[in-house]
Structure formats: structure tokens, C-alpha cells
């Protein structure tokens, strides 16, 4: 306690969320140390960013600095911001400091970890690439996820990002015995609240027994200071790392939105007086992104697979923020408004979504060849659509008509009923193994199911269900 008592300073300057603190000679806190300021029944936590000389440090506040003034006492906590980890975090909502904000009472745990940690050593990494099976046909077949990889999720409003995220959370819990951590970085508070309510409705969060929930939520929304938005991703990542390293689990880490993490870093950089780089971004953009992304990986103990929603400013893919993100991604899942308007869910675009895992030496020849044939078929259908729109189907050659018929069946077979959507659709969710997906698409491509009506393939699980549905349609 004596060192803490010794390490007291006083606020010397406040510029918005940036606070300069003067300490007695020889007691300067370290970079990234948390500084606690108590004022009028509230505690403000700041993080040391720069040592200015003359016994002064420059810090960035994680809470609102409203009401602070020069001369108020500030105490060096002696360590970085620490957050609770473990089972107690499941089903709860936290802020950047690891404080629960869901009004369900305090967290009772002594297990806390600092948010600034080194990435795993090279010797701890799992080097053999393996597929992370999601049970969602379109993803597993055409743009498979890497276990311990990073996936970019692209899509506008209302195309099904949230439902896809919730289905992934549900499936990892059921099939991998894993948990998920959701980091809401700089997005709308209303969206965060909607997600929480939907998770309770779909039983992803178990209200009766919180520790049986499948997800922990960490929010630093749009109205928070830039310091909080910049660090909330690290808070979520620290919770995920504990599940991977100590519980030896497979973890899904969702970051919505990775662009807001960069944006907050840019605001902080400007407030600290750093010279801006290209397009006004921080000069440390690549370093900050690397520090976050390098901690998301597979080790010999478990894995963190990260799915990151990527906002592309003004649809400019060359903007430094998305361009820096792309360098770290192993797969991209692109959601299409066109497919959503056709009622095909999940509305994952089979031609725009990509994955570095789709190589014959990783997924095997059968999977690779089937995926390529599906894409070729859909691409040919896309090329023929203009002709169909102008002249009609009858003007196509016999071969092209067959291609169109199969492509329409494939398009419908890529749809799938979700577990988390059961409450809305009334149809039970389906988990389809990769083997079942490959077998089903091979049968369609080989013409074994040419005599089945295309509506038999819509919103079913495996191919046997489609055949059964076709029989039921015939009976009607």
C-alpha cells in the first residue's frame, strides 16, 4: 500500500479526454499503467500514453472527463487496466474497464488479467491449418473458416449479419463445446441492446443460469470517449484469451466494427498531437492493428477464431483502415442484398466470398473440385441472366437451360434454416456437416436430382431432406 500512497499525482491540464498529470520526482508511472481519479462519487480511469518530461505524464480517459479540474488527486494503480475473466463473464455485459453494465449485480471473482499482453510465442502456435466447421453449408463449402483465423464480415444494414453472428455463437457452443466473446466497438447503443435482447430470446444467453450462457458481451459504443472505443477490443480479446489458454476451449471472438477501432485510434492520435499519416489516420495504424490481430490465433491449447465486421468508408477498399485490415484476414464472408431480397438466407454471396483455406492440399481434392464446380455453375448462371431477362429461357441452348436449372437448385440449397431463427420462422434449425454438404452439391452437379422441383431445395438441411421434401410436394 505504501507504494500506492507514494504514487499520487495531481491533474495539471485537461484537453477533452486527454489529461496531463504531474507526479512527485522519481515516481512516474509506466506507459499503459491505469491511473485512478476519484471525484464527486465517481471514479475516472485513465491510461498513460506519453511521458512528457518535467515529471508529467499524458493520459487518455476511459470515461467522461466532465466536472474534472486542475489540482485533483490522481493515483497510479501500478498496473494496466485489468478485467475479470472466466465463467463469471458469460451472459453478462461489460464496459472497457470490465465493469458490468447490465444492472445484474457485481462480478464475484478474483481472476483478473491486464488488457495489454504479449501475443503467444512462436513455439506455442498451432502450425497445421485446419478448417473450423460451422455447420452452415455456404460457408463450409465455398469460403471455409480457418481454426484460429480471422474472417471479415461485409454487409450493409438489414442483410442478416446479426442472425449469422448468433447462429455461429450457437453452433460453436453445440458442436465444439466452445464459447464466444462479442466486442461491440464504436457501434450504435440501440444495436447493442437489440443484440442482447435477441440473444436472450434465442437462448444464446440463459437468463435462469447465466454461467450456462454461450457468450460474454463487451461494449464500448459510439457515445463513449475515444480511449474506451480504442481499448474495448483488447478487453474482449483478454476475456477470449483466458478461455483459450486456461479452459483450453475453442473461442469465437466477434468484433463489430473493426473500422471503429481504427477510427478511435485516429482520434486519440490526433489528441496526443502526433503527426497524421495518409488520409489523416494515425502514423501507428499498422502497429496498433498488428498488436490486436497477432493475439488472435490458434495455440496448442485451443483457438480464437475471430469474425470481424468491416465497415468500408465510402465503399473505398483502398482506404488505409480496411486495407490494413485485409492484410490480416484469412477469409471474407460477403452478404448480398440481392440474395436477401430473394428470401435466400443466409444471404452469403457465393461468388464474392473468399477463403485462403480453399486449396486442394488443405481441404482435399473432393471438397475443392466440388466448390469450384458450384462457383463455375453460378458464374455461368449470372452471365446468362441478361439474356434470360431480354429473350427468356426458351432462347437458351439445351446445355445452358440445364446449367440454369441446376444453378437455381444450388442457389436454393445454399439457404438453410437457422437454430436462432426458429422463434421467428417456426422451422427447426439444421446443422449440416461438411461431408453432407459436399455429397449434396455433388448430386445436384452430376444431374442425379434434375427431376426434382427447385422449391424442394429451399431452406432444408442436407440433401436427404430435399429429396423428402420433393416427395411431399409430389403427394400434394
UniProtKB/Swiss-Prot annotation:
Q: What is this protein for, i.e. what is its function?
A: Produces ATP from ADP in the presence of a proton gradient across the membrane. The catalytic sites are hosted primarily by the beta subunits.
Q: Where in the cell is it found?
A: Plastid, Chloroplast thylakoid membrane
SUPFAM superfamilies according to UniProt: C-terminal domain of alpha and beta subunits of F1 ATP synthase, N-terminal domain of alpha and beta subunits of F1 ATP synthase, P-loop containing nucleoside triphosphate hydrolases
Where along the chain is ATP bound?
155-162
Which GO molecular function annotations are given, in alphabetical order? Answer: ATP binding; ATP hydrolysis activity; proton-transporting ATP synthase activity, rotational mechanism
Q: How does it assemble?
A: F-type ATPases have 2 components, CF(1) - the catalytic core - and CF(0) - the membrane proton channel. CF(1) has five subunits: alpha(3), beta(3), gamma(1), delta(1), epsilon(1). CF(0) has four main subunits: a(1), b(1), b'(1) and c(9-12).
Q: Name one GO biological process term.
A: proton motive force-driven mitochondrial ATP synthesis
| Topological category with respect to the lipid bilayer | Peripheral membrane protein
Per the UniProt record, the source organism is Galdieria sulphuraria
Q: What is its EC number?
A: 7.1.2.2
Catalytic reactions of this protein: ATP + H2O + 4 H(+)(in) = ADP + phosphate + 5 H(+)(out)
**Xref: HAMAP family:** ATP_synth_beta_bact (MF_01347)
Q: InterPro entries per the record?
A: AAA+_ATPase, ATP-synt_VA_C, ATP_synth_F1_bsu, ATPase_a/bsu_AS, ATPase_alpha/beta_chains, ATPase_F1/V1/A1_a/bsu_N, ATPase_F1/V1/A1_a/bsu_N_sf, ATPase_F1/V1/A1_a/bsu_nucl-bd
Q: What is this protein called?
A: ATP synthase subunit beta, chloroplastic
Family statement drawn from the similarity comment of this UniProt entry: Belongs to the ATPase alpha/beta chains family.
Q: Where is it found, in Gene Ontology cellular component terms?
A: chloroplast thylakoid membrane; mitochondrion; proton-transporting ATP synthase complex
Q: What class of enzyme is it?
A: translocase
Pfam families listed in its UniProt record = ATP-synt_ab, ATP-synt_ab_N, ATP-synt_VA_C
Matching entries from Gene3D superfamilies are given as: 2.40.10.170, Bovine Mitochondrial F1-atpase, Atp Synthase Beta Chain, Chain D, domain 3, P-loop containing nucleotide triphosphate hydrolases
Protein keywords: ATP synthesis, ATP-binding, CF(1), Chloroplast, Hydrogen ion transport, Ion transport, Membrane, Nucleotide-binding, Plastid, Thylakoid, Translocase, Transport
